[in-house]
């Protein structure tokens, strides 16, 4: 008889590694940490390339129209449609590009990833609202200033999951 715990572990292992090739390629192209990308995918879709969010987000990294169109334009892709984001490769490329853009805006801080994740989750306007006084450069103060519990949890869960994936390359 198969041990149920072993079966559960095996299924989780397979799911955790189902998009590795795409993640590594996107990380290389955009010079990002593959463990971070993988952690975002885990949080956003649990590795389901067909995931659909309530606000129109699609795919592994739950990309919305505006971000997808910005990425397509920057990549020189013409005739891009939001539904193309069901394609795992396009989705991870777009999401990684967008996350890199968000993180790069916060290089003056002690932890640009925290600010970038907040922007990825809650939008730039909210990050700018929370980004005052100490919170402008201190990530611990910034997290305290975040008004949405879901965004705080989002950042914390991704940072923890990133550590789990730290040896992933």
Feature annotation, model-predicted:
Residues 1-49, 72, 89, 107, ...:
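Export/targeting segments at the very N-terminus of extracytoplasmic proteins
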Residues 9-13, 23-27, 49-58, 77-89, ...:
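Second-shell loop/turn segments in exported
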Residues 42, 97-104:
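Short glycine/serine- and small hydrophobic-enriched flexible loop segments
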Residues 42-67, 123, 160:
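Cell-wall polysaccharide-cleaving catalytic domain and substrate-binding groove, primarily
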Residues 47, 67-75, 127-130, 134, ...:
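A short secondary-structure junction motif
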Residues 55-78, 94-98, 137:
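Substrate-binding/active-site groove segments that recognize
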Residues 110:
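Catalytic-center loop of serine/cysteine hydrolases
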Residues 114-169:
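Catalytic and substrate-binding regions of cell-wall glycan-acting enzymes that process beta-1,4-linked
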